[in-house]
Design a protein with these regions (language model features):
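Mid/C-terminal beta-alpha module of Rossmann-like enzyme folds, strongest
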Residues: 2-4, 9, 200-265, 276-344
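N-terminal Rossmann NAD(P)H-binding glycine-rich loop of SDR-like oxidoreductase domains
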Residues: 2-32
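SDR active-site strand-loop-helix element
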Residues: 13, 37, 79, 112-117, ...
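Conserved glycine-rich Rossmann-like NAD(P)H-binding loop of the short-chain dehydrogenase/reductase
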Residues: 32-39
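NAD(P)H-binding glycine-rich loop region in Rossmannoid oxidoreductase-like domains
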Residues: 42, 46-107, 117-124
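Substrate-positioning beta->alpha
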Residues: 96, 160-161, 181-202, 210, ...
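Conserved beta-loop-beta element that borders a ligand/cofactor-binding pocket
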Residues: 116, 137-158, 164-170, 179
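Glycine-rich portal/gate segments that line the openings of hydrophobic small-molecule binding cavities
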Residues: 339-340, 347-413
């Protein structure tokens, strides 16, 4: 039931992504009226909450579209960043943030909530973390009050950080790692806590115009995180050998080969771990009274949800939704991108529904019905090129929706 005091519209950008796709149902449960601003509206068609929200199709890089999308909005979430985008991601992120800030001012929005990356401004960080800090500053340059939450590693079923941790520990009983794995500290936080904070700061005047650090109760090295995962998963303690010669670039290739993550995303995650990312200046505990989940419990919860096929969103949804230059099926031919379509027809003695239910299981553990070894070669070639290969698998063994991964393919319609 709607809360009578929550009549304003709350806009959510990045609703097809990992965090945004989980935030929307939380906002609905809290009684808010939600407008999802997305580039591809079909990506939300199969969400259980689709009929409860307003969907507005807009490209965040186009000012006129963003101004229209924010018309009538009271407050807005900015959950867009380009962890796996192209080399010009910094310019793209800055441009979109500036457009969004100006559009918010024009529409007299009361608050922007932005999820950024944890880390002190004056330190030398990775290009992606530096860009996320810059986006926060650009959003704050306008007249609309901004609440910026900064988080480091997010642990949850389907998150990129969790999948990297999971793959490394489960695949490799012995690891040769760069020395920062045993030295730099991070403060992981559960996705459930992130969602709680995102909802809680919305109507909290104490958070307006503030940069707030968010983290769980544990401060650990990445080696300690891997040992914790092994313990929770019931695996033997991994042998981790630090060496001084593995650069982030070499490490990202190694992660790409052993995990479902594409090399650009792996590099972004690794770069973010090469310096300390812990809560320091303005902790969320000073604003909200909430007992965050420790790493042991958050890993256990994530593993349980994976085993029970409870993965409402996955990192692969975020990668696709955040790369604006990737083509969509609905894009006109003059736009430059193109989705190739190979259409085949074959008569069948069974119903279309039965055929489709079988087709929907393709890929992942099921395989490709014919010439599996050729698909394996295709996946290996994709890995060599820095892609996801076959390890990305599927979100669910028998369900498909727009945006879902099927090994190295993505469902577009």
């Amino acid at each position: 039931m709607k809360n009578a005091n929550k009549t304003g519209i709350i806009a959510v950008t990045g609703a097809t992504g990992y965090v945004g796709g989980r935030l929307v149902p939380q906002l609905l449960e809290a009684g808010y009226n939600v407008r999802c601003i997305v580039r591809n509206s079909e990506a939300l068609d199969d969400r259980s909450w689709r009929s409860k929200v307003e969907v507005y199709k807009a490209d965040l890089s186009l000012k006129d579209q963003v101004i229209e999308a924010l018309n009538g909005v009271e407050k807005a979430y900015y959950l867009v960043h380009s962890m796996a985008a192209s080399s010009n991601f910094e310019d793209l992120e800055s441009s979109m943030a500036e457009i969004f800030s100006k559009a918010a001012d024009i529409n007299k929005i009361k608050q922007i909530v932005y999820l950024g990356g944890l880390g002190e401004d004056e330190k030398n960080h990775s290009p992606h973390l530096t860009s996320r800090h810059k986006v926060g500053k650009i959003l704050s340059n306008g007249s609309t009050p901004v609440t910026e939450l900064r988080a480091a590693i997010i642990i949850g079923s389907g998150s990129a950080s969790f999948e990297m941790l999971r793959s490394l520990v489960e695949v490799l009983p012995i690891m040769v790692v760069p020395k920062w794995v045993t030295q730099t500290r991070c403060q992981p936080v559960a996705i459930s806590d992130i969602l709680f904070y995102l909802v809680s700061v919305l109507d909290n005047d104490k958070t307006l115009g503030k940069i707030i650090d968010v983290g769980g109760p544990d401060i650990l090295t990445y080696r300690e995180m891997m040992h914790t995962y092994a313990q929770v998963a019931g695996l033997k303690k991994r042998i981790i050998i630090p060496v001084p010669v593995l650069t982030p670039r070499l490490s990202s290739h190694w992660v790409n080969l052993t995990s479902p993550l594409p090399i650009r995303l792996a590099r972004s995650l690794i770069d973010s771990l090469t310096s300390d990312v812990v809560v320091s200046n303005n902790p969320i505990s000073a604003v909200l009274n909430h007992d965050a989940e420790n790493l042991h419990n958050s890993i256990g919860r994530a593993l349980t949800r994976v085993q029970n096929l409870q993965i409402p969103t996955r990192w692969s949804n975020s990668v696709k939704s955040q790369i604006a230059e990737l083509p969509e099926l609905s894009d006109p031919e003059w736009s430059g991108g193109r989705v190739l379509i190979d259409s085949r027809e074959q008569k069948s003695l069974v119903t279309g529904k039965k055929v489709m239910s079988t087709i929907k299981t393709i890929g992942g553990d099921t395989g490709w019905f014919a010439f599996d070894w050729l698909w394996a070669v295709r996946g290996f070639i994709d890995k060599l090129a820095g892609g996801v290969g076959l390890r990305r698998g599927r979100r669910h063994p028998s369900e498909l929706r727009v945006g879902d991964p099927v090994d190295f393919f993505t469902v577009v319609k």
